[in-house]
């Protein structure tokens, strides 16, 4: 942790001290923010809804892409201007000199998942209440997501060394949480009303590798700290469970039967990033197009409704038109249900910035539009195939039209995927899971009525 030695004396509010929090970046950072606010509330701090009502502001930053770094620095500046007392944490906090050079008035800077350092910084600059109010904190902790779904982080860091990524430099190597800790947390979340668990990490399929799949006991049974046993344990809780950030390793095949049994939601988030062998090699990513296509076909033989979400990068250094055509052919043949596409940009300290053959910005832009057009065609065909079917959907909340609710199928994760516009549904509430008759579709979203 880096402190500003010219800091003012700590505040000692006459009422309960209030901390504002700004959470940027991915769901993994959101989980970090949830853990921090849980600790703050456990010690009696209030969480302020805005800058004006806060005695101090905590900014949880992202530092993965240059655009994310710029957004984080802008958010820090906004917090300083609006409040004046700012502590910075998160991925960009791993480079304190960058933050302090841009914003010398920050009170302290801590790195990612340094919860104790964050609390120490808060204590230094905002005196904690005399009597902690532990009873104010629910057993499941405090969350920044709606009541009916929650992110479940199973590990920190990553052992992969993708040439475009600096996550291992920011968050370190893979560090898996003990499986009984993860399953107990999931159990508490379900008891608190969560209907959907979203399993996240940097590499979910590598879970447990760093601790040699150490066995632990949960509910009287032994579970090894590995992807398959995690899926079995979570599948016993009776809620929707999504697996995010899964690499296409062979052992992922073992989880597909659990989806066929209805224990795990038939959904895999696999960041393929590309399909061309030369580009994947330059990215230092695993993947063989023919093998991957064959495995996807086998998965869908077992689970016809399996939805696959992925992310891709276009315009990676050295990417040729032929490479790009291979990528387009792949998303069409694999029938990728949901896809995010990003134009390559250099990341500070990433190896890819040193590669030859950087693609001009106008070519990146043109390829991005072609990718999105091709993906829209795939998604539209997948969506149209649902019309006339009756599917389970989970309610997220009210829509803009009278009597309308926004819902999702099992093929759609919150925030990033498609939605279902459910008519005549005013009697339903967030978290309800119902059967819905699909009456229409557009490129991505569905339209339905309660069955």
From Swiss-Prot:
Residues 384-451 form the TRAM domain. Signal peptide: none annotated. Residues 17-127 form the MTTase N-terminal domain. Its main location: cytoplasm. Its cofactor is [4Fe-4S] cluster. [4Fe-4S] cluster 2 binds at residues 158, 162, 165. [4Fe-4S] cluster 1 binds at residues 26, 62, 91. Residues 144-381 form the Radical SAM core domain. It catalyses: L-aspartate(89)-[ribosomal protein uS12]-hydrogen + (sulfur carrier)-SH + AH2 + 2 S-adenosyl-L-methionine = 3-methylsulfanyl-L-aspartate(89)-[ribosomal protein uS12]-hydrogen + (sulfur carrier)-H + 5'-deoxyadenosine + L-methionine + A + S-adenosyl-L-homocysteine + 2 H(+). Binds 2 [4Fe-4S] clusters. One cluster is coordinated with 3 cysteines and an exchangeable S-adenosyl-L-methionine. Keywords: 4Fe-4S, Cytoplasm, Iron, Iron-sulfur, Metal-binding, S-adenosyl-L-methionine, Transferase. Its EC number is 2.8.4.4. Pfam families: Radical_SAM, TRAM_2, UPF0004. It comes from the Bacteria. It is found in: Cytoplasm. PROSITE patterns: MTTASE_N (PS51449), MTTASE_RADICAL (PS01278), RADICAL_SAM (PS51918), TRAM (PS50926). GO terms for cellular component: cytosol. GO terms for biological process: tRNA modification. GO terms for molecular function: 4 iron, 4 sulfur cluster binding; aspartic acid methylthiotransferase activity; metal ion binding; protein methylthiotransferase activity. Belongs to the methylthiotransferase family. RimO subfamily. Catalyzes the methylthiolation of an aspartic acid residue of ribosomal protein uS12. This is Ribosomal protein uS12 methylthiotransferase RimO. It comes from Hyphomonas neptunium (strain ATCC 15444).
């Amino acid at each position: 942790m880096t402190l500003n030695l010219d800091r003012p004396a700590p505040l000692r509010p006459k009422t309960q001290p209030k901390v504002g929090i700004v959470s940027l970046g991915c769901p993994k950072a959101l989980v970090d923010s949830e853990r921090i606010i849980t600790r703050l509330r456990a010690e009696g701090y209030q969480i302020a809804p805005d800058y004006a009502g806060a005695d101090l502001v905590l900014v949880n930053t992202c530092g993965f892409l240059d655009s994310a770094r710029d957004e984080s620095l802008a958010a820090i500046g906004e917090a300083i201007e609006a409040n004046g007392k700012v502590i910075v944490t998160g991925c960009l906090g791993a480079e304190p000199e960058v933050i302090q050079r841009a914003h010398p008035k920050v009170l302290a800077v801590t790195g990612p998942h340094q919860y104790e350092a964050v609390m120490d910084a808060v204590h230094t600059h905002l005196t904690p209440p005399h009597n902690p109010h532990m009873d104010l904190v629910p057993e499941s902790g405090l969350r920044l997501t709606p009541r009916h779904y929650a992110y479940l982080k199973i590990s920190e860091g990553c052992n992969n060394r993708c040439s475009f990524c600096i996550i291992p430099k920011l968050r370190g190597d893979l560090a898996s949480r003990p499986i009984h800790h993860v399953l107990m947390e999931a159990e508490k979340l379900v008891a608190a009303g969560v209907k959907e668990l979203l399993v996240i990490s940097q590499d979910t399929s590598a879970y447990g590798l760093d601790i040699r799949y150490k066995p632990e006991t949960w509910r009287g049974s032994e579970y090894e700290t590995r992807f398959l046993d995690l899926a079995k344990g979570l599948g016993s809780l009776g809620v929707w469970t999504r697996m995010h950030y899964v690499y296409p390793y062979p052992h992922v095949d073992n989880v597909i039967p659990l989806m066929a049994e209805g224990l795990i939601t038939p959904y895999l988030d696999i960041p393929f990033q590309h399909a061309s062998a030369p580009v994947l090699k330059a990215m230092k990513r695993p993947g063989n197009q023919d093998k991957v296509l064959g495995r996807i076909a086998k998965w869908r033989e077992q689970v016809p409704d399996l939805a696959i979400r992925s992310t891709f990068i276009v315009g990676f250094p050295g990417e040729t038109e032929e490479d790009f055509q291979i990528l387009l052919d792949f998303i069409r043949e694999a029938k990728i249900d949901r896809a995010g596409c990003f134009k390559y940009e250099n990341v500070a300290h990433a190896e890819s910035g040193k590669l030859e053959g950087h693609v001009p910005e106008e070519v990146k832009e043109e390829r991005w539009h072609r990718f999105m057009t091709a993906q829209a065609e795939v998604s539209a065909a997948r969506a149209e195939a649902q019309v006339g079917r009756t599917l389970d959907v989970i309610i997220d909340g009210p829509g803009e039209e009278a009597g309308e609710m926004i819902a999702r199928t099992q093929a759609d994760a919150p925030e990033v995927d498609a939605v279902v516009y459910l008519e005549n549904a005013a009697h339903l509430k967030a978290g309800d899971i119902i059967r819905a008759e699909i009456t229409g579709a557009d490129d991505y979203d569905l339209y339905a009525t309660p069955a």
